[in-house]
C-alpha cells in the first residue's frame, strides 16, 4: 500500500507513513529502505508525478461476479448515503481519527478487463487512507480466492455462478442495524426502516456528488436517541430495544464489528443482546466480520432456495445438509440468496 500511495498519489510522505500503519516517519523510512533498498523520497522522485486525485488500484482474483455484488448493493442502497451507478459504487463514510470524527466519501469503479477496482477517497480521509483501503477490500471481498471457493459452491443444488463474493461493508455497525431491522421482513421493508433512520439521524457531509449528502448515524447517536422518536419511525418496540442495546455496546467498545474481530466472542456478545438471536448474529458475522463459514441455519430464504419439504425445515437438518460446504458456507448463503432475489 505504501509503495502505491507514493507512486499513485500526491500525499506527503508523512501521511503515507501514517496510512501504512507507522507511528513515526523514521521507522517508516527504515522499513521501506530495508525492503526496497532505497528510501520513499527516492521512489517518488524517480517516478512520474501523479496527477491530482488519481485513483488507487486494488486488484482481485478473477472471476468476480460483479452483477451479483452490484445487484445486492443496489437493492439495499440508502438514499443520500450510497449510490450504485453502473460499475461504480459511491458512499459516504464516517470514521474516528485521534478521537475526532472524520467524514468523507469513497468512490469505487470496477475495471473488469484489468481485474481491478479503482478507488478514490475524499481528501478529508487522507490521514486514514490505509484503513479506508482495507475497508474497501472487505466491502467488496477483494481478497477472496475463487479457486478455493468455487469448487465447494459447485456442490450446491443450483447452477454455479463463478466468482461469488461476500458483500461486506465499510461500517460494521451499520450492517448490524440493517440486520436487526431486517428480522422477519422483506429486503424492501428493511431498507425502508433503515432509510427512515438515515432521514432522521443522518449527519450532513460535503461531497461532490449530489446523491450523497449524509453519513449513517453513529452508534453514539442511536444509543442516546429518544426511544419514542425511534419508535415513531415505524420500528416496533422490541426492535428499538435491540437497536439501542447494540448501539450502546458498540459505542462503549464492548462489541467490535469489523473484519478480524474474534468470531465466537462476537457471536456470544451479539446473542446476549435483547432481541438478537443466532440468525441475526450469524448474518452480522457474515457481512461485518467477513466470516466465510457463517451459517444462519434458521433462515427461511435458505430453506426456500433449497426446496426443502415442510418436514425438513429445521435448523438441524439444514445444517447437516450444509456440511459439505464448509468452510465456505457464507458464500453458499449469498449464492442461494441471489437465486431467491433474482428468479429466472
Where in the sequence are the language-model features?
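HhH-family (HhH-GPD) DNA N-glycosylase catalytic core used in base-excision repair
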Residues: 1-344
Amino acid at each position: 500500500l505504501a509503495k502505491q500511495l507514493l507512486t499513485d498519489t500526491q500525499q506527503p510522505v508523512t501521511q503515507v507513513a501514517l496510512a501504512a500503519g507507522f507511528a513515526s516517519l523514521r521507522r517508516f523510512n527504515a522499513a521501506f529502505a530495508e525492503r526496497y533498498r532505497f528510501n520513499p523520497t527516492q521512489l517518488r522522485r524517480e517516478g512520474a508525478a501523479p496527477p491530482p486525485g488519481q485513483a488507487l488500484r486494488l486488484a482481485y482474483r478473477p472471476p468476480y461476479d460483479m452483477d451479483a455484488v452490484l445487484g445486492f448493493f443496489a437493492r439495499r442502497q440508502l438514499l443520500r448515503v450510497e449510490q450504485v451507478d453502473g460499475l461504480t459504487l459511491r458512499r459516504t463514510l464516517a470514521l474516528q481519527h485521534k478521537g475526532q470524527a472524520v467524514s468523507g466519501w469513497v468512490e469505487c469503479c470496477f475495471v473488469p478487463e484489468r481485474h481491478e477496482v479503482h478507488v478514490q477517497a475524499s481528501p478529508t480521509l487522507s490521514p486514514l487512507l490505509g484503513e479506508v483501503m482495507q475497508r474497501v477490500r472487505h466491502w467488496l471481498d477483494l481478497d477472496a480466492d475463487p479457486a478455493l471457493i468455487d469448487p465447494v459452491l459447485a456442490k450446491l443444488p443450483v447452477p454455479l455462478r463463478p466468482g461469488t463474493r461476500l458483500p461486506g461493508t465499510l461500517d460494521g455497525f451499520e450492517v448490524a442495524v440493517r440486520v436487526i431491522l431486517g428480522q422477519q421482513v422483506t429486503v424492501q421493508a428493511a431498507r425502508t426502516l433503515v432509510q427512515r433512520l438515515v432521514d432522521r439521524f443522518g449527519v450532513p457531509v460535503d461531497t461532490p456528488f449530489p446523491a450523497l449528502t449524509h453519513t449513517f448515524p453513529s452508534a453514539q447517536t442511536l444509543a442516546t436517541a429518544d426511544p419514542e422518536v425511534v419508535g415513531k419511525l415505524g420500528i416496533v418496540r422490541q426492535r428499538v430495544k435491540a437497536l439501542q442495546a447494540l448501539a450502546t455496546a458498540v459505542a462503549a467498545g464492548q462489541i467490535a464489528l469489523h473484519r478480524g474481530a474474534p468470531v465466537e466472542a462476537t457471536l456470544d456478545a451479539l446473542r446476549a443482546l435483547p432481541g438478537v438471536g443466532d440468525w441475526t448474529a450469524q448474518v452480522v458475522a457474515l457481512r461485518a466480520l467477513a466470516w466465510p463459514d457463517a451459517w444462519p441455519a434458521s433462515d427461511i430464504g435458505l430453506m426456500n432456495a433449497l426446496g426443502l419439504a415442510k418436514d425438513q425445515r429445521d435448523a438441524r437438518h439444514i445444517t447437516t445438509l450444509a456440511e459439505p460446504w464448509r468452510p465456505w458456507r457464507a458464500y453458499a448463503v449469498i449464492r442461494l440468496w441471489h437465486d431467491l432475489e433474482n428468479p429466472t
